[in-house]
């Protein structure tokens, strides 16, 4: 059984504040195949503190700096594509071909699209050549992101990647029913070299987190 009890907070895999195990079930055979921890308020507080601290420097990064990291993330995602497909197949009980082509493929497609959109996006937009007025787009701050079990990496990519692209920091809580793909994505974030605290992950249920 996979031991996935730790959370990703401030660039490190850390143990929860208090033990609270939950088995992850493969719906295709109804067998447990992994164990995670359900987080608490104390864990959330640690992640929020890390995200708030990281935001002060992350919000000042240039578009080019964020693009470089997202392109590295895409490279890592492609390298570990089959791992992601296997994680999704197990946690959803989904056929491997569907988990690969539709589920994991959508995550890659969203990453590629957001990279393209970021390249095209102007964060400082003038109204017209005759006016000195302009719109300056700024990151909003720390984002709390919750994703469902049925389109795990699809929804993670749709929420996490644009937040990263715009200079926000975040805490992700994937579905406790299908959390392994999210934890693998956290490993990819780490491997890509994002600064500590920019992305944090805590597992948990609705009542606790």
Question: Where are the predicted features?
Answer:
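N-terminal Rossmann-like NAD(P)+-binding subdomain of aldehyde/semialdehyde dehydrogenases
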Residues: 1-124, 128-131
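Rossmann-like NAD(P) dinucleotide-binding subdomain of oxidoreductase/dehydrogenase enzymes
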Residues: 123-209
